[in-house]
Amino acid sequence: MTPQDLKNVMSSGLLSFPITDFHDNGDFNAKGYAERLEWLAPFGASALFAAGGTGEYFSLTASEYPQIIQTAVNTCRGKVPIIAGAGGPTRFAIECAQAAEKAGAHGILLMPHYMTEASQEGLAAHVEAVCKSVNFGVIIYNRGITRYTPETVARLCERNPNLVGFKDGVGDIEGMASMFLAMGDRLAYLGGLPTAEVYAAAYKALGTPVYSSAVFNFIPKTAMRFYEAVKNDDQATQHQLLKDFFMPYLKIRNRSAGYAVSIIKAGAKIVGHPAGPVRAPLADLQAEEIEMLAELIRKVEPV
């Protein structure tokens, strides 16, 4: 897949980030992960992001990462494109990007670097080093301490033709509007706030109709139904699902830091597709919270 092909894929449809399966002892469970992807692939996502934030990229080892990407590519070949997460320190991000390209992934999402703040010049050097280390497409992730200005992105796009996407996880409406107006159709734009459905209609109004759904991991039919409602400006369906599921879901998710990932694994277990525990420093949901989530799931997608 060429970078332009990746941009085209990222320009329409619903995206998702599968959780990563672990055994009870925390080791990567390749068989469980393959079975998960086989289950999710037919539901209609435009692409799946392996080893992304929801896939606990931040807790993976250098030896596990290629296994995870290779499992995803092998399982989904001919079914749905696989985009790999890559990030952290520049040299490690390059190692991951090159490993993903070797495994046959169709591109990478370049996630935030680790811990330290950086100037726009430093961010640009980081992105350019990764872009020039691979031939396939790169999507940058605007989130946390990694925040790009339109001017920085414009310079990067001039120098790196394989930079084809911009994912926003900040939620700065003015900043996102400025980016879209500055870059136009040079990039594909993705909404990437946690529980992106809550913000999907607003992002669509800004020219960003594509977003990634975490709940696709356990209620894929409902996730697709909500996406279609946004796509078709069906406000009645959007509001009903926000009322019945997404807003109460946020109350559970917001009970503890790190639950944005933990709640997804809990949901997968509830619907019969368990992925094992989250890795520290994350913590699994409490029994009471799991029952609260199960009740919400029964309202929209009975098990």
From Swiss-Prot:
SUPFAM superfamilies: Aldolase
UniProt-listed Enzyme Commission number(s): 4.2.1.41
GO MF: 4-hydroxy-tetrahydrodipicolinate synthase activity; 5-dehydro-4-deoxyglucarate dehydratase activity
Record field: catalytic activity: 5-dehydro-4-deoxy-D-glucarate + H(+) = 2,5-dioxopentanoate + CO2 + H2O
Taxonomy, superkingdom: Bacteria
Pathway: Carbohydrate acid metabolism; D-glucarate degradation; 2,5-dioxopentanoate from D-glucarate: step 2/2
Tagged with keyword Lyase: yes
InterPro entries, per the entry: Aldolase_TIM, DapA-like, Dehydro-deoxyglucarate_dehyd
GO biological process, alphabetically ordered: D-glucarate catabolic process
PANTHER family linked to this entry: 5-DEHYDRO-4-DEOXYGLUCARATE DEHYDRATASE 2-RELATED, DIHYDRODIPICOLINATE SYNTHASE
NCBIfam families: KdgD, PRK03620.1
Recorded family membership: Belongs to the DapA family.
Protein name in the entry: Probable 5-dehydro-4-deoxyglucarate dehydratase
Source organism of the structure: Acidovorax ebreus (strain TPSY)
